[in-house]
Amino acid sequence: MRTLATIALSFAAGVFAAVLLGVGVWQLWAAGACLLAGLVLLGLKRTMPARLRLRGMLILFALCGALVYTALFQALVQAPVTARCGQMGEFSGTVLSRPVETEWGVRVTIRLSGSAAKAEVYADAEYAGLEPGQQLSGTAQWQDGARIRENDVTAFTSRGVFALLYARGPLTAEEGSAGSIRWLPQRAVYALREKIAAIWPDGDTAVFVTAELTGDRSGMAEEDAAVMTQAGVAHLFAVSGLHCAFLVSLLGLLLPVRRRALGAGLSMAVLLFYMVMVGLTPSVVRACIMQIFLLAAPLLRRESDGLTSLSAALLVILLANPFAAAGVSLQLSFAATLGLVCFSQRLSGFFKGLYRGKKRPVRAVVSFVAANLSASLAAMVFTIPLTACYFNTFSLIAPLSNLLILPAAGWSFMLAFVVTLAGFLWLPAARVLGWGVWALVRYVLWMASALTRLPGHALYFSNRYLKYWLVYAYALFTACAITGERRRKYAVAAALAAMTLLLTVGLNVRLSRCGEMNAMAVNVGQGQCTLLYAGDQAVVVDCGSSNSYVDAGSRAADQLESMGIHRLRAVAVTHYHADHTNGLYQLLARLEVQTLYLPDIEDEYGVRERLLRLAEKNGIEVVYVRRTVECPLGGAVLSLYPPVGEGDLNEQGLTALCSAGDFDVLITGDMAGSTERKLVGQYDLPDIEVLMVGHHGSRYSSSQELLQAVRPETAIISVGDNSYGHPTQEAMDRLSQAGAEIYRTDRQGNILVTVHGGD
């Protein structure tokens, strides 16, 4: 079976190289070189050991095949779609799933007619009733799914989506194959979700169970999602090996089939159905294929090999879509499983060996703890660099979280599955049984919340020194692995890693708190978030982004917690637009906040009401700024001015002025020049050192009147990927003419200004 692993892993290496380095002519040259080298090995029959020669040929020919296959896939599947992008054109395709509600309507995934490529159609809300199998056609603006506004994007192509279609005019929906048995798995998952909602009327439990059984956590409360992520157990909602193992165990309990072959066949069929039902994500495809290998091995009188089944699953996924190699979910799923295959048994043996007694109850507890800890630590070996790169996080509490939460999560998964199936037979009985699931869900969320309240439960790579520590730690343990077998060296390595980690964290906290006052513009893309802090006291003014791929709340919270700040003196909201507020829900879920300052204006988006509900839930004082309010901040003072303009939300926002001695920072939100003129006419603003430029550098903001009144020395523009032309040349010219030195978050990243001695 290791022959299959050699071929599959070599093929995967070729695909990863082609996708991550960029598809191009170099692939064909590299494929030719691999082919030539393989043919050379083929001729070395007498001068090279047969096994080594065969292994080398398999690797080289598989690499050649991968490079050629990826080039052909790009030319035959992606390129024809890309050629139509950037223009208006007709489309037609088969609906693959029910539409998903968006801010402006719905989004629906289709498979384009006559192609293996998928596309996402953005249309009006009237198309929310589309069903899988229907034929959808119309006219749309075609957008390349791999490149958006000069930025390379992998989120779509890794799912096989190569075009984004923005509907123009009415669409035509025909019956197609909707209702046929082909779409039974999709109908099953919709029925499952509806039954879950009927069994558990309280939204929190229903959303948790839906996420656990199907991987769909779109309706989960921000605070619940935050604590699960921070506790390191968010993988419970990525349908994977854990779920498939639970499902097979459940089938063994519900279907006590005596004949092994029949039982294995039924389990395989259910796994395949479940795989299609939850959406063919990389994690569930990998898990199901590995489970099928595990079930089939005894029937074929072979031993199951974890590396072979893992590599076979990777081969299947990459054959279906080579661009899946760039997907974060695939990389995390396979990295975690590779760690389990390589290290879990060794770690388990090590932990079990720590207890040499013979008492059965104690040995049982030791075995349980060893199995859970070894699995958690092994899964983290290769995933820590990935989570650091993609999510900026290193969860220290994850091994303990998995030990305390996974057993309950396993029981809740199996019980929820049984209860949901029972709900199709008799709903009242299912609701009674559902209380057991409710209790398990409450325990999981409570435990996750309790663990995230522990100091140092996670580290964030906003600490710029942490990446160097990570390289050091990996080098340290790698050196241990390639030297002799003495266990003591691992204890020494662990002690050194722990001590240097404490130094790394302490150094960042100390350096970040120097100065009388600090102002940081956090890079949140096209949005705004300003951190103002002095010592251990901090205020956040606005937190949001209009870029869907930017989690403004996480970025701000990561930055604050990496500086040792876990409690906010206040949060101030200039106005209620999403690019200034949609990160606040995550921020309020993760950090304790004393006071929330809001403008006393109504908004049409429901942001104010949602913030009020969160404030009430978390015990946060709410203050409406109807007159000038001063908020002490260590050695500085934050002054908040009430709205002075009229019209839309931009003109009815608050103004913030933070002063430390003679050093002043002014934040005007998104107000336009007409409102800026009212501001300087109504309030005696001082000459300022730093201006957080209004409206991301819009030509309508940063008026001459404002700049002449406050005479900023430094101008910081919070801006990112946008279609408005921000920052505009007109605004940049006015700032330059006013003598301000300009900084931009899209170019410099986070921008920090530190005040020493108030001057």
Residue ranges and their predicted role:
Residues M1-T82, R286:
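N-terminal leader/targeting segments
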Residues L9, S158-M290, L295, A570, ...:
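Aromatic-rich juxtamembrane segments at the membrane interface
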Residues A578-E616, P712:
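Active-site HxH/HxHxD metal-binding segment of metal-dependent hydrolases
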Residues L568-D579, I601, L691-H695:
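Metallo-beta-lactamase
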Residues R2, G14, M48, L165, ...:
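Hydrophobic alpha-helical transmembrane segments in multi-pass membrane proteins
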Residues T595, K678-N750:
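Cap/insert and terminal regions of metallo-dependent hydrolase folds
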Residues F61-H235, S554-D558, R567, I601-D603, ...:
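Membrane-interface helix/helix-cap signal primarily in integral membrane proteins
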Residues R217, L318-A326, S449-A570, E616-V690, ...:
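Core dinuclear metal-dependent hydrolase active-site scaffold
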